[in-house]
A protein has these predicted regions:
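Extracellular, beta-strand-rich glycan-interacting domains
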Residues: 370-372
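Formylglycine-dependent sulfatase
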Residues: 1-359, 365, 374-398, 402, ...
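Small-residue-rich loop/turn and linker elements
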Residues: 416-421
């Protein structure tokens, strides 16, 4: 296969879900990303492999599921890639691309392991990232290059000195949350961070145009998982794993914009990018390339289902799911409340309001009709279960079990998993104290000391 030698600008955010105007949120101000979506390929059924930061990002950058690459929990709790796992920057560096990272990464406490030629992860607030990334783009190395710009936004918190909140009156509260003043205000603050980060992306896009690099650069925008709200982040519902993903081809390809409505998994990003760049896809990659569909507008689906997983967040909470265009089937492997809220959500206004409402025991199995019930509010495997629902669930369960076997997905016992989670969490708290450092954009506060590559 002949490499195309195009550049790649990859921009990723925290905790956004699909909260952009381009995804049907008119109450969100995101004009630059909406424009990017109109100019490129807007993915409407992209799903993270996991509803939390490190496992999701691990799949996006390796093309492998968390149980395969080893990143089944949060990097700042001590989880790391398995030895020998190669990332997108590793692969592109070996193929002749110059690779650089500015800002957020949440895959490791040792960023030099990620395979970039140069990196500065010391500060991941969007203005710092964009200042350094635009300077880098003004005098880039000899192409081709991969430039990754990682924003801390839109992770909690949303301090007003950084983000001017939207008008709470205009906020549309999602169906899975009660419509209260505190929740509206919380969403308004979230929207404020979106607007600031959107403008920062605009500066990157403007720099590409001003330098002429937009003619030869693939622009990829993505987030890791759903927003930090109850029944979104840290769950395997659509609001938890559904992600914004936009790909704009180089201007010189004259590729027509499109809305891509096929199912797309986080593990598919790496093989799709390699294919678009004309590079061979390594044999250990578990994702599928969608490049042919994106370039030729073919309508043959690449995949008919996506698989999602959660094992460790701030606690041991093992869940697996399979999702088609018509149904979502979830298996819960431990006795837990309806929602096991991670720290950042539990301490938020929506978390405090919702916590008393989600203490009932979670069912072992869940099935949702995504055509009739897109917000996944009525479990078809409840007391009113029908023969049809049971049959559909059984078929999906077989596919899920087959996928777990193929990916060597071993779920620890309740005793072992809980002890493992406690060990990682206790070590994290012993090192960092009660301050939750994952909510900081400053790498040194997150336990990452070697935050610059030599020369940065």
């Amino acid at each position: 296969m002949t490499a195309q030698r195009d550049n790649v600008l990859l921009v990723h955010w925290h905790d956004l879900g699909r909260y952009l105007g381009a995804y049907g949120h008119p109450d969100v101000s995101s004009p630059r990303l909406d424009q990017l979506g109109a100019e490129g390929i807007l993915f409407t059924r992209a799903h993270a492999t996991a509803p939390l930061c490190s496992p999701s990002r691990g799949s996006l950058f390796t093309g492998r599921y968390p149980q395969s690459n080893g990143l089944v929990g949060l990097a700042h709790h001590g989880w790391e890639y398995r030895t020998g796992v190669r990332t997108l920057p590793h692969i592109l560096s070996e193929a002749g691309w110059h690779t650089a990272l500015f800002g957020m990464q949440h895959e490791t406490s040792y960023p030099s392991k990620l395979g970039y030629h140069e990196f500065d992860v010391s500060n991941s607030y969007c203005e710092y990232v964009v200042e350094h990334a635009t300077h880098w783009l003004s005098e880039p190395p000899k192409p081709p290059f991969l430039l990754t710009a990682g924003f801390f936004e839109t992770h909690r918190p949303y301090p007003r000195e950084r983000y001017d909140p939207a008008d709470a009156v205009d906020v549309v509260v999602p169906d899975y949350l009660p419509d209260t003043g505190d929740i509206r205000q919380d969403l308004a603050e979230f929207y404020g961070s979106i607007s600031v980060a959107d403008a920062a992306v605009g500066r990157l896009l403007d720099t590409l145009e001003e330098t002429g690099l937009d003619e030869s650069t693939w622009v990829v925008f993505m987030t890791d998982h759903g927003p930090a709200l109850p029944r979104a982040k840290s769950t395997l519902y659509d609001a938890g794993t559904g992600i914004a993903l936009i790909v704009r081809p180089p201007r010189n390809t004259r590729t027509q914009p499109q809305v891509y409505g096929e199912l797309f998994s986080g593990v598919d990003l790496l093989p799709t990018l390699l294919d678009l760049l004309g590079l061979d896809i390594p044999a250990d990659i578990e994702g599928m390339s969608h490049a042919r569909n994106l370039q030729r507008h073919d309508i043959e689906p690449v995949r008919t289902e996506v698989y999602t997983t959660k094992t460790y967040h701030d606690s041991f909470d093992p869940i697996r799911a399979i999702r088609t265009k018509e149904y979502s089937y979830i298996e819960n492997y431990a006795s837990r409340p309806l929602l096991d809220l991670p720290w950042d959500i539990a301490e938020s206004a929506p978390g405090r309001i919702m916590k008393p409402l989600v203490l009932a025991q979670r069912p072992e199995r869940e099935l949702y009709d995504l055509v009739e019930d897109p917000t996944e509010s009525h479990n078809l495997l409840g007391s009113d279960i029908t023969d049809k629902a049971e049959a559909i669930a059984n078929d999906l369960a077989l596919l899920l079990d087959d996928w777990r076997n193929k990916t060597n997905d071993v779920i620890p016992s309740e005793f072992a998993g809980t002890r493992i989670a406690e060990r990682y969490t206790e070590t994290y708290l012993r090192i960092h104290g009660p301050q939750v450092t994952s909510r900081s954009a400053i790498a040194s506060e997150r336990g990452i000391q070697h935050d610059h590559s030599p020369g940065q």
